[in-house]
Amino acid sequence: MSLGLVGRKVGMTRIFTEEGDSQPVTVLDVSNNRVTQIKTPATDGYSAVQVTFGKRRAIRVNKPSAGHFAKAAVEAGEILREFRVAEEILGTLSPGTVIGLDIFQPGQRVDVTGTSIGKGYAGAIKRHGFASNRASHGNSRSHNVPGSIGMAQDPGRVFPGKRMTGHLGNVRRTIQNLEILRIDAERGLLIIKGAIPGSKGGDVTVSPSIRSARPTNNGNVNAAAKGGAKSGKKGG
């Protein structure tokens, strides 16, 4: 339940640390994020902030969306995303408020959501990482087939969830716990370590990582428990 930003994937490059190490990074354009709607428990049943990114010509906006943007007195955008937030935050925001990159800091961990690149219809080897069969030595027709997909008359069917051939990619995916290396507030760019789903120009959503907020177990409790178990054993 934290406020985030929406934007577009610019592409990948690399940067060098002070020690001279090369790190692959993804550049995200999250400039000009503005609030289009505030949702409260009284009116909508939950608290959330709706944000838009980019610009779209009025002729390219359908009537329902045009009315929605006009009601908020906000220039029409290309993307609309909603962030669930605590009710206390709603008082600091209003339609038209610009959300800057100052909600993030270098070194902070974030979750990035995007749409993976579509690969079309793919076989089980590419889709699920299956191993291929022998290239020769008696194998003449089953090099890349998935193999058996079930049993005999009993149960006489293929179990649900069986990994088979099918469409690969073009689905929403979230990569968690990525690190922000640099922030270019002047140009509205986030430099994030590693890769994220999608091709250049794809829509992305960036929000504070939910994993970094969880309590971690450093192993001290387990170590103490093991020590107690050993000390409780009877001597030989």
From Swiss-Prot:
Q: Where is the composition biased (Low complexity)?
A: 217-228
Which residue ranges traverse the bilayer? none
Q: How is it modified after translation?
A: Methylated by PrmB.
Iron-sulfur listed as a keyword: no
The protein's UniProt keywords, in alphabetical order, are: Methylation, Ribonucleoprotein, Ribosomal protein, RNA-binding, rRNA-binding
One GO location term (cellular component): cytosolic large ribosomal subunit
Q: Which InterPro entries match?
A: Ribosomal_uL3, Ribosomal_uL3_bac/org-type, Ribosomal_uL3_CS, Transl_B-barrel_sf
Query: Where N5-methylglutamine occurs, residue numbers?
Result: 153
Compositional bias, Polar residues, is annotated for: 133-145, 206-216
Q: Name one Pfam family in it.
A: Ribosomal_L3
A single BP term in Gene Ontology: translation
Where does the record place the region Disordered? 132-153, 200-236
User: Which branch of life, at top level?
Assistant: Bacteria
What are the GO MF terms of this UniProt record?
A: rRNA binding; structural constituent of ribosome
**Family the UniProt entry places it in:** Belongs to the universal ribosomal protein uL3 family.
Tell me, what does this protein do in biology? One of the primary rRNA binding proteins, it binds directly near the 3'-end of the 23S rRNA, where it nucleates assembly of the 50S subunit.
Q: How does it assemble?
A: Part of the 50S ribosomal subunit. Forms a cluster with proteins L14 and L19.
Q: What is this protein called?
A: Large ribosomal subunit protein uL3
